[in-house]
């Protein structure tokens, strides 16, 4: 499909991205219309998708999207959680109209309802999950593009891009690749330079994992602030200027108390039957009398 043009050939970094995201890994079941997209089957029963066919169909889908004059007439739909973020990012990059979440029945066929819309091209993430828009597209002769796994039904699908449409990384990478090729064919970005948008922005993330990461980051920031607060110098608002005192002994007046001289006694000469409780009482009386000046 890419012809003999070297510019449209699949690069090595693209192959590495496909392999890292698991785009080549299909399911254990195989639809008869997807047989010519299969490269081989593993010993555990998983079918391996031929990435060369994936790249050719990706370029064909990009050419079909570029052929639409008004980018807003391209409808991109994903009812599954793994493709909703990728669909919104693709629409923001290419100007398409996204429908992330539940598709309202009758959007393409019921002219009475307020959500009625007539797009010129439909791109879905999963033909099995997005069967309602595919069925309505067949009623209004709307061309369709779909990311198809090995067990996906190809009914009402005009351009099937064989890939792993179950994994969050694979779905995000396929929408990123499709958006990049559309922008390259429009001339918005150059093929000589890599696209500055990373594929990680198209990946689905579980809200619970995001909350856990935010809580861990907040706890780490709090502990870091506490650690810095213990070792940093006190702020100037808490420092008070103290008067300079040349001699600290002059600042405090201590009352002078005469020191009494007690005769030295020979403890060995006292009898062993002496009452020890009487001696402290007499001394305590003297100390009380000596310290009357303090009061």
From Swiss-Prot:
* Compartments, record wording: Cell membrane; Cytoplasm; Nucleus
Q: Show the GO MF annotations.
A: laminin binding; laminin receptor activity; structural constituent of ribosome
Q: Return the annotated region ranges for Interaction with PPP1R16B.
A: 54-113
Q: Where is this region: Laminin-binding?
A: 161-180, 205-229, 242-295
Name the domain of life.
Eukaryota
- Which key words are in the record? Acetylation, Cell membrane, Cytoplasm, Membrane, Nucleus, Receptor, Repeat, Ribonucleoprotein, Ribosomal protein
Where do the record's region annotations for Disordered lie?
A: 218-242, 266-295
Q: What is its main location?
A: membrane
Q: State the InterPro entries in the record.
A: Ribosomal_uS2, Ribosomal_uS2_C, Ribosomal_uS2_CS, Ribosomal_uS2_euk, Ribosomal_uS2_euk/arc, Ribosomal_uS2_flav_dom_sf, Ribosomal_uS2_vert
**Matching CDD domains:** RPS2
| Residues in [DE]-W-[ST] repeats | 230-232, 247-249, 266-268, 275-277, 293-295
- The annotated site for Cleavage falls at 115-116, 133-134
Q: Which residues carry this modification: N-acetylserine?
A: 2
* Family the UniProt entry places it in: Belongs to the universal ribosomal protein uS2 family.
The note filed under miscellaneous reads: This protein appears to have acquired a second function as a laminin receptor specifically in the vertebrate lineage.
Q: What does this protein do?
A: Required for the assembly and/or stability of the 40S ribosomal subunit. Required for the processing of the 20S rRNA-precursor to mature 18S rRNA in a late step of the maturation of 40S ribosomal subunits. Also functions as a cell surface receptor for laminin. Plays a role in cell adhesion to the basement membrane and in the consequent activation of signaling transduction pathways. May play a role in cell fate determination and tissue morphogenesis. Also acts as a receptor for several other ligands, including the pathogenic prion protein, viruses, and bacteria.
Q: What is this protein called?
A: Small ribosomal subunit protein uS2B
Protein source organism: Homo sapiens (Human)
């Amino acid at each position: 499909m890419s012809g003999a043009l070297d510019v449209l050939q699949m690069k090595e970094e693209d192959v590495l991205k496909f392999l890292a995201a698991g785009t080549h890994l299909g399911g254990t079941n195989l639809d008869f219309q997807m047989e010519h997209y299969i490269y081989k089957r593993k010993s555990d029963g998983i079918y391996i998708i031929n990435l060369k066919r994936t790249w050719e169909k990706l370029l064909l889908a990009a050419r079909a999207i570029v052929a639409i004059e008004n980018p807003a007439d391209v409808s991109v739909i994903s009812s599954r959680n793994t493709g909703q973020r990728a669909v919104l990012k693709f629409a923001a990059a290419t100007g398409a109209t996204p429908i992330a979440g539940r598709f309202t029945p009758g959007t393409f066929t019921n002219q009475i309802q307020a959500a009625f819309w007539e797009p010129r091209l439909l791109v879905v993430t999963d033909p099995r999950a997005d069967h309602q828009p595919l069925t309505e597209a067949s009623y209004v002769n709307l061309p369709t593009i779909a990311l198809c796994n090995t067990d996906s039904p190809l009914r009402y699908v005009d351009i099937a891009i064989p890939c792993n449409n179950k994994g969050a990384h694979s779905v995000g990478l396929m929408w990123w690749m499709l958006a990049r090729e559309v922008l390259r064919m429009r001339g918005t970005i150059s093929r000589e330079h890599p696209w500055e948008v990373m594929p990680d922005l198209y990946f689905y993330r579980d809200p619970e994992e995001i909350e856990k990461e935010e809580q861990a980051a907040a706890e780490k920031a709090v502990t870091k602030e506490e650690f810095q607060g213990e070792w940093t110098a006190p702020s100037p608002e808490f420092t008070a200027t103290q008067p300079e005192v040349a001699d600290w002994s002059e600042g405090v007046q201590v009352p002078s108390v005469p020191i009494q001289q007690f005769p030295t006694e020979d403890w060995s000469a006292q009898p062993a039957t002496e009452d020890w409780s009487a001696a402290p009482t007499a001394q305590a009386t003297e100390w009380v009398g000596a310290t009357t000046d303090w009061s």
